[in-house]
Amino acid sequence: MIILYSPAFTNHLKENRYFYKVKHLLENPVYNALLSGDKQLSHGNDEVKYFDEEVSPFAGFEEGNENGFSRLYESLNPGRKILYANPETIPHPGGWQVQHEIKGLQFIYQGSKLFSNDFSNVTPLMETNVDEMVQLARLTKPGPFGKRTIDFGHYHGIFDNGKLVAMTGQRLHVGDHTELSAVCTHPDHTGKGYAFKLLQHQLQIILKNEQQPFLHVREDNQRAIALYERMGFIVSRPMNFYFMKRI
């Protein structure tokens, strides 16, 4: 298969930034997470794995399984929406309506393990905060976020006058790699360093657990990419996201 990389990703390679050239668990992060660190949230069978809809729309199957989408079709009800991730572009599978495609980048953390930030205003988020978390995610659109996304764990936020204005957490747990996710700040509170502080706080948690942090971002989100690179994240590979609906 021929892959046409975007100018943004090509520039990353030209500038000699880090890029995995070998097979790696993060080439198929969803399926491998459902086999390992997120096994307790896994549904499906030996061939296909997926999360409960309220946790995440992500679904996956073993690399090279040509019947993967057919098996998912057999396992899920009509109208069920899924999100499929792959470093390569894929043909649209039969039985599925591709509603949206996003070209993204996957980043691996290679920065400092020492953080001097003051985390005193960073608060653990609980079930009682879910409604506010969903509202903030809908407003800022960091990615799919449902009533049970908090089940991935380690969500923290910053409040202003009792209102949740910024948050981040963890999502996929792939072997010894942990994904940072749901990085979002209310538009009335940008420019205050909240995202930077919350990301550093998550990095501290992940590194203390002897895990390798990683994340995904839209390739056209230059503001976020600049922040991640400033923090010590380095691009590892492209990652395409396919939002699909079972016909």
Label each residue range with its predicted role:
Residues H100-Y109, H177, I234-I247:
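Conserved catalytic-core motifs of GNAT/GCN5-like acyltransferases
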Residues G68-R71, G191-Q204, A226, R230:
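Conserved acetyl-CoA-binding loop-helix of GNAT-fold acetyltransferases
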